[in-house]
Amino acid sequence: MEDDKLIVRIISKEGEIIRLTEEGERFLSSCLSSLKDAILSLHSIEIKGNIVSGLGEGKIFLSMEYYKSQINKIMGFDPFPGTLNIVIYDKASLENRLLLDSSPSLMVPEYKQKDRVLGAVKLYPAAINKLTPAAVVIPLRTTHPKSVIEIISPFHLREKLNLKDGDEVTIEVYV
């Protein structure tokens, strides 16, 4: 740092004093600003994929009062009873999907009923083809591979966006 003229070292009988130079103060201020932006800013991750038909399990779960009420409480909308399944087809989008696993999420907690356990679900606010509100739903217990994501919205997304199997969509996930 001394070679970069960011600090000045003063040696005396009492010891050593290290002071920031004006250039050092500017550099430190720039670092703090970058850290603040990184911590406080809303960032998004883009994921592209193609629409695929699901097995209808999303409809079953989103028809359950527990999930409906939790999603409304957390996301602020009543979800359409069904998810839109998207298969990720390119490397960059799959890498971005994997980033979600280590990104902070909103969470529907696990709920124990008498005869079953309703599993926890991660929620990420999102836009699909620029349409909001929407959310990426990642159940903690799922049969889907990482290359398939599910989207929820208050809208019937296939109708609202005129989508059919094979159509490409862009998901902007806010993390």
Swiss-Prot record:
Q: What is its EC number?
A: 2.7.1.161
Q: Does the keyword Kinase apply?
A: yes
Catalyzes what?
riboflavin + CTP = CDP + FMN + H(+)
- Which UniProt keyword terms apply here? Flavoprotein, FMN, Kinase, Magnesium, Metal-binding, Nucleotide-binding, Transferase
Signal peptide limits: none
Q: Which GO terms describe its biological process?
A: FMN biosynthetic process; riboflavin biosynthetic process
Q: Where does FMN bind?
A: 142, 150
Tell me the GO molecular function terms. Answer: magnesium ion binding; nucleotide binding; riboflavin kinase activity
- Identify the residues that bind CDP: 54-59, 155-158
Q: Which cofactor does it need?
A: Mg(2+)
Which residues of this UniProt protein bind Mg(2+)?
83, 85
The entry's free-text remark on the cofactor is: Binds 1 Mg(2+) ion per subunit.
Tagged with keyword Cell membrane? no
Function, in words? Catalyzes the CTP-dependent phosphorylation of riboflavin (vitamin B2) to form flavin mononucleotide (FMN).
Family, according to the entry, reads as follows:
Belongs to the archaeal riboflavin kinase family.
Entry protein name: Riboflavin kinase
The protein's organism comes out as Saccharolobus solfataricus (strain ATCC 35092 / DSM 1617 / JCM 11322 / P2)
Taxonomic classification: Archaea, Thermoproteota, Thermoprotei, Sulfolobales, Sulfolobaceae
